C-alpha cells in the first residue's frame, strides 16, 4: 500500500501540475484538499479536475463561516495591518488552511503534506510553520524548492506535457489569491515598478472614476467589536462580508497598490482589493475613538501593529498571538454601537457615531464651564505638566 500525501489543492497552475509530479517522483497516493474560504471557484469543477489530474481523493472543506468568525473578526477587532497598509487577506487564511490540512492528514494517516507555494514567497513559511506547530512529525514536500521548474512559464509547459488543463497564458500572467476578505494580484507586468497597474484586473472593485456618481450612506452596527448589522439588518457573518464587498466595490472602495517587505527578505509588489475590510476598519476605528480611553486606544495601536506582524509572518499558533487576542477582547467590551459612513468614488467619510458607551461628553468638551471641569484648573495643570521644560530652560538660561 502506497504512503499518502495531503496536497493543499486550489485547481490553479501550481497545484494542478503537482499531482502528476508527486506521483512521478515520489510514488505517493495523493489526497487533494481544497479549503473553501470564499475564493469563488466552482467546487464541482475543482473536484473533477483533481481526480482527472491523478488524485485518488479530494476533500472540499467549506470553512467560510469559521474563517470570518475565528479569523477575520479578530482582524477587525485588532485592526491588524502589516506595514500600515496590507489588510492580511492571505495571511489570515493560511493558518486555517494549515489546520484543515493537518486534520485531514491525521484522518487519512498521511505522513506528508505538500503545498504549491513558491520558494520566494511568504506562504511557504505560513503553511509549514502552521503544520509544524500542530504536528511536528508530519513531513513537508515543497515542489517549488525541489523541481526543475523555475518559472510560471515552465509550469505552463509542464502542464501541457502531462496533459493538465490550465487556464493561464504566457502573455498575461498574474498570481491571484482570492477569498472572502480580499483579492491579491502579483507578478507579470506588476514587477516593473514603472508600470501603473491595470484597472481591468479588478475582480471586486469598480475603478473609483467609474463608480457611482451619487454618494452611498452605510450604517454598520458593532457588538463588542464585531459587526452584526448592516443598515439595521442582522446578517450572518459571511453575508456581512459579502454585502460590504458589494457596497464597497461598487463605490470604488478598497484598492491598495503596495510594496511590502516579505518575510523571506525581498520586497514585492501586490495589488489588493479589500472593500469589506476597508469599510469595517474605518467604521471600527471611528467607534473605538469614541469608546476607548486615551491610554488603551494608544497602546492598542502598538498591539495592532505587532499582531499584524505576527499574522504576516505565519506565527498564528503562538502564545503571543493568543495573549494579544485576549487583550484585544478586553478592549472590545464597550465597542458597541452604530457608525454611519458616506462613500463616494473611493473615499470614506465617517458621518456619525451612536453608542451608549461614548466617553465623549458634549457638556465637558464644549468651551463652556461644567461641574467636572473648570477653566481655572488648567493653570495648575500646565504648571506641573510643563515643570520639566521650565527647569531645563532655567538651567540653560
From Swiss-Prot:
<feature type="binding site">
    <location>
        <position position="260"/>
    </location>
    <ligand>
        <name>L-citrulline</name>
    </ligand>
</feature>
<comment type="similarity">
    <text>Belongs to the argininosuccinate synthase family. Type 1 subfamily.</text>
</comment>
<dbReference type="GO" id="GO:0000050">
    <property type="term" value="P:urea cycle"/>
</dbReference>
<feature type="binding site">
    <location>
        <position position="272"/>
    </location>
    <ligand>
        <name>L-citrulline</name>
    </ligand>
</feature>
<feature type="binding site">
    <location>
        <position position="184"/>
    </location>
    <ligand>
        <name>L-citrulline</name>
    </ligand>
</feature>
<comment type="subunit">
    <text>Homotetramer.</text>
</comment>
<feature type="binding site">
    <location>
        <begin position="8"/>
        <end position="16"/>
    </location>
    <ligand>
        <name>ATP</name>
    </ligand>
</feature>
<dbReference type="InterPro" id="IPR001518">
    <property type="entry name" value="Arginosuc_synth"/>
</dbReference>
<feature type="binding site">
    <location>
        <position position="126"/>
    </location>
    <ligand>
        <name>L-citrulline</name>
    </ligand>
</feature>
<dbReference type="InterPro" id="IPR018223">
    <property type="entry name" value="Arginosuc_synth_CS"/>
</dbReference>
<protein>
    <recommendedName>
        <fullName>Argininosuccinate synthase</fullName>
        <ecNumber>6.3.4.5</ecNumber>
    </recommendedName>
</protein>
<feature type="binding site">
    <location>
        <position position="91"/>
    </location>
    <ligand>
        <name>L-citrulline</name>
    </ligand>
</feature>
<dbReference type="InterPro" id="IPR048267">
    <property type="entry name" value="Arginosuc_syn_N"/>
</dbReference>
<keyword id="KW-0067">ATP-binding</keyword>
<dbReference type="InterPro" id="IPR014729">
    <property type="entry name" value="Rossmann-like_a/b/a_fold"/>
</dbReference>
<dbReference type="GO" id="GO:0004055">
    <property type="term" value="F:argininosuccinate synthase activity"/>
</dbReference>
<feature type="binding site">
    <location>
        <position position="175"/>
    </location>
    <ligand>
        <name>L-citrulline</name>
    </ligand>
</feature>
<feature type="binding site">
    <location>
        <position position="123"/>
    </location>
    <ligand>
        <name>L-aspartate</name>
    </ligand>
</feature>
<dbReference type="GO" id="GO:0000053">
    <property type="term" value="P:argininosuccinate metabolic process"/>
</dbReference>
<dbReference type="GO" id="GO:0005524">
    <property type="term" value="F:ATP binding"/>
</dbReference>
<dbReference type="GO" id="GO:0005737">
    <property type="term" value="C:cytoplasm"/>
</dbReference>
<keyword id="KW-0436">Ligase</keyword>
<keyword id="KW-0055">Arginine biosynthesis</keyword>
<dbReference type="Pfam" id="PF00764">
    <property type="entry name" value="Arginosuc_synth"/>
</dbReference>
<comment type="pathway">
    <text>Amino-acid biosynthesis; L-arginine biosynthesis; L-arginine from L-ornithine and carbamoyl phosphate: step 2/3.</text>
</comment>
<feature type="binding site">
    <location>
        <position position="122"/>
    </location>
    <ligand>
        <name>L-aspartate</name>
    </ligand>
</feature>
<dbReference type="InterPro" id="IPR048268">
    <property type="entry name" value="Arginosuc_syn_C"/>
</dbReference>
<keyword id="KW-0028">Amino-acid biosynthesis</keyword>
<feature type="binding site">
    <location>
        <position position="122"/>
    </location>
    <ligand>
        <name>L-citrulline</name>
    </ligand>
</feature>
<feature type="binding site">
    <location>
        <position position="118"/>
    </location>
    <ligand>
        <name>L-aspartate</name>
    </ligand>
</feature>
<keyword id="KW-0547">Nucleotide-binding</keyword>
<feature type="binding site">
    <location>
        <position position="116"/>
    </location>
    <ligand>
        <name>ATP</name>
    </ligand>
</feature>
<keyword id="KW-0963">Cytoplasm</keyword>
<feature type="binding site">
    <location>
        <position position="86"/>
    </location>
    <ligand>
        <name>L-citrulline</name>
    </ligand>
</feature>
<dbReference type="InterPro" id="IPR023434">
    <property type="entry name" value="Arginosuc_synth_type_1_subfam"/>
</dbReference>
<dbReference type="Pfam" id="PF20979">
    <property type="entry name" value="Arginosuc_syn_C"/>
</dbReference>
<dbReference type="GO" id="GO:0006526">
    <property type="term" value="P:L-arginine biosynthetic process"/>
</dbReference>
<dbReference type="InterPro" id="IPR024074">
    <property type="entry name" value="AS_cat/multimer_dom_body"/>
</dbReference>
Amino acid at each position: 500500500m502506497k504512503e499518502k500525501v495531503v496536497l493543499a489543492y486550489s485547481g490553479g497552475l501550481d497545484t494542478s501540475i503537482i499531482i502528476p509530479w508527486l506521483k512521478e517522483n515520489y510514488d505517493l497516493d495523493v489526497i487533494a484538499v481544497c479549503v473553501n474560504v470564499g475564493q469563488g471557484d466552482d467546487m464541482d469543477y475543482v473536484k473533477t479536475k483533481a481526480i482527472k489530474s491523478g488524485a485518488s481523493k479530494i476533500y472540499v472543506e467549506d470553512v467560510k463561516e469559521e474563517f470570518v468568525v475565528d479569523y477575520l473578526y479578530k482582524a477587525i477587532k485588532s485592526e491588524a495591518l502589516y506595514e500600515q497598509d496590507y489588510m492580511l487577506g492571505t495571511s489570515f487564511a493560511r493558518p486555517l488552511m494549515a489546520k484543515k490540512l493537518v486534520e485531514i492528514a491525521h484522518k487519512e494517516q498521511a505522513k506528508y503534506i505538500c503545498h504549491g507555494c513558491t520558494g520566494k514567497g511568504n506562504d511557504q513559511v505560513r503553511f509549514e510553520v502552521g503544520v509544524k506547530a500542530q504536528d511536528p512529525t508530519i513531513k513537508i514536500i515543497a515542489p517549488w524548492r525541489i523541481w526543475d521548474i523555475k518559472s510560471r512559464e515552465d509550469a505552463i509547459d509542464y502542464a501541457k506535457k502531462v496533459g493538465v488543463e490550465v487556464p493561464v497564458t504566457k502573455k498575461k500572467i498574474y498570481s491571484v489569491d482570492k477569498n472572502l476578505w480580499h483579492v491579491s494580484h502579483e507578478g507579470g507586468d506588476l514587477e516593473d515598478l514603472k508600470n501603473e497597474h491595470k484597472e481591468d484586473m479588478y475582480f471586486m472593485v469598480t475603478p473609483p472614476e467609474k463608480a457611482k456618481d451619487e454618494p452611498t450612506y452605510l450604517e454598520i452596527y458593532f457588538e463588542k467589536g464585531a459587526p452584526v448589522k448592516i443598515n439595521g439588518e442582522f446578517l450572518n457573518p459571511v453575508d456581512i462580508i459579502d454585502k460590504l464587498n458589494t457596497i464597497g466595490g461598487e463605490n470604488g472602495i478598497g484598492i491598495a497598490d503596495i510594496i511590502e517587505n516579505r518575510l523571506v527578505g525581498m520586497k514585492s509588489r501586490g495589488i489588493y482589493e479589500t472593500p469589506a475590510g476597508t469599510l469595517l476598519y474605518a467604521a471600527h476605528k471611528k467607534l473605538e475613538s469614541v469608546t476607548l480611553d486615551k491610554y488603551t486606544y494608544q497602546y492598542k495601536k502598538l498591539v495592532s501593529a505587532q499582531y499584524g506582524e505576527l499574522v504576516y509572518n505565519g506565527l498564528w499558533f503562538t502564545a503571543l498571538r493568543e495573549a494579544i487576542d485576549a487583550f484585544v477582547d478586553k478592549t472590545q467590551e464597550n465597542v458597541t454601537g452604530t457608525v454611519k459612513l458616506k462613500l463616494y468614488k473611493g473615499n470614506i467619510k465617517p458621518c456619525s457615531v451612536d453608542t451608549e458607551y461614548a466617553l465623549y461628553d458634549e457638556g465637558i468638551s464644549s468651551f463652556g464651564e461644567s461641574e467636572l471641569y473648570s477653566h481655572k484648573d488648567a493653570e495648575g495643570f500646565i504648571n506641573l505638566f510643563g515643570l520639566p521644560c521650565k527647569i531645563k530652560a532655567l538651567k540653560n538660561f
